[in-house]
From Swiss-Prot:
Assigned protein family: Belongs to the radical SAM superfamily. Biotin synthase family.
Protein name, as recorded: Biotin synthase
Summary of subunit composition and partner proteins: Homodimer.
The organism's place on the tree of life at top rank: Archaea
Known cofactor(s): [4Fe-4S] cluster; [2Fe-2S] cluster
Pfam families xref list: BATS (PF06968), Radical_SAM (PF04055)
UniProt-listed InterPro entries: Aldolase_TIM, BATS_dom, Biotin_synth/BioAB, Biotin_synthase, Elp3/MiaA/NifB-like_rSAM, rSAM
Transmembrane segments: none
Protein species of origin: Methanococcus maripaludis (strain C6 / ATCC BAA-1332)
Cofactor binding note of this UniProt entry: Binds 1 [4Fe-4S] cluster. The cluster is coordinated with 3 cysteines and an exchangeable S-adenosyl-L-methionine.
GO biological process terms, semicolon-separated: biotin biosynthetic process
Amino acid sequence: MREIKLNPDSLEIYEKSDSGKLNRNDLIDLWNLDLNDLLNISCALKKLFNKDKIDLCSIMNAKSGICPENCIFCSQSKHNTSKIDTYELKSKEEILKNAKSVEKYSNRFSIVVSGKTVTDLEFEKIIESIEEIQNKTKLKVCVSLGLLNKDKLKALKEKNVRIHNNLETSENYFKNICTSHDYNDKVKVILEAKKIGLEMCSGGIFGMGESIEDRVDLFLDLKKLGVDSVALNLLNPIYGTKIYEKIKFGVISPINSIDALKSICIARIALPDKVIRLCGGREHVLKDMQKYSLFALDGLMIGNYLTTNGQNIQSDLKMIKEMGFER
């Protein structure tokens, strides 16, 4: 990791972040700072809380497409017209095979399914897959199964897995990206999961037309909810989705690399003691600037995403090593 030298103003922000004294306006004002200053502050906070480590995770789209929800960014929604592979829940053998294929590189493996939630039968099969992975690999298991009820959350607690449920954006902006469920539906699941004692991963997507204020409000909600890991995604608009059309016709401006990096840094500063993990869209948005995001990150999703291809894993490993980090 590079040597960190903070100027007096940056040092003050660093100290306020560490002591939890940055308010909403303070975080919004960070947008006006130079990117290099934000990277320096973020890097200092990362070094304080997580040293030089980058935690790697991988996901599997274990059930794809035909989702009844109307999220405008998602190629799996039946309300969009994206051409993707659709299939029912994969077998435990297929899921285990996928997990084993990334075990050499990843610390975590997440089973992700499309839909608002899972049926009882699907849930039973997923529990079997969790047991297979835990018994036959060294991977920590995560699941992203939608809006789960208390009984299913308790069953997952018994299996010692981490739950993933993205808030996606701020409460104020959520109605612009989805109306088939609301923000509070997700909040209720997160609160119940935390009450039961589950580890929780949640986050959002940058580049859907939201403001910096919306991003800061998302970070503050994640802090208030006490999530353990924060998953940040950069919008990669997929043909056939409603948001692709909005960008095509200039209704929404696509996110650029500087915008994305600043947002990642502000997430780090707002949530200094959380695992900040960069996931989908980083290759599309950051391109050659991906390496700079590592100064603000504790985690990176590697391999393929739900319906899009990720960067070659060896390229990610090389990038991490060249930037002076460990995994």
